[in-house]
Design a protein with these regions (language model features):
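Beta1/beta-strand and adjacent pyrophosphate-binding region of the FAD-binding site
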Residues: 1-14
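Glycine-rich flavin
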Residues: 2-3, 20-27, 32-123
Length: 123
């Protein structure tokens, strides 16, 4: 059975930063996450919302500002499937960055898709 000095539950912004700092201080550290590294904000909240807002600003500029710059825009079609893929790629890239930060600081990542075993001992 593995033994750690610190086990951080949750790999959101508070969790992964705490785990990295503990590891930097020389503690054998693990982080436990159920769904995705980076937490809700990075994966389904703030970041995906801001990615979509950025895309909508791009669309608005193409329609309203481009003609003032001399571009003749006849029409723009939105491929919502591709837009969703792009948004997901933004989130995946950032989540991958969190993973690299954790690995680079020697934090053990434990992805657990079920509840923790109640017989685990935390001292």
């Amino acid at each position: 059975m593995a033994s750690f000095d610190v086990v951080v539950i949750g790999a959101g912004p508070g969790g992964y930063v705490s785990a990295i700092r503990c590891a930097q201080l020389g503690l054998k550290t693990a982080i436990v996450e159920r769904e995705f590294l980076g937490g809700v904000c990075l994966n389904v909240g703030c970041i995906p919302s801001k990615a979509m807002i950025s895309a909508s600003h791009f669309y608005h500029r193409a329609i309203h500002d481009a003609p003032n710059m001399g571009f003749k825009v006849k029409g723009i079609d939105i491929d919502y499937g591709q837009l969703a893929k792009w948004k997901q790629s933004v989130c995946d890239k950032m989540s991958g960055g969190v993973q690299q930060l954790l690995k680079g600081n020697n934090v053990t990542i434990l992805m657990v898709r079920r509840n923790l075993n109640p017989t685990l001992k935390f001292l």
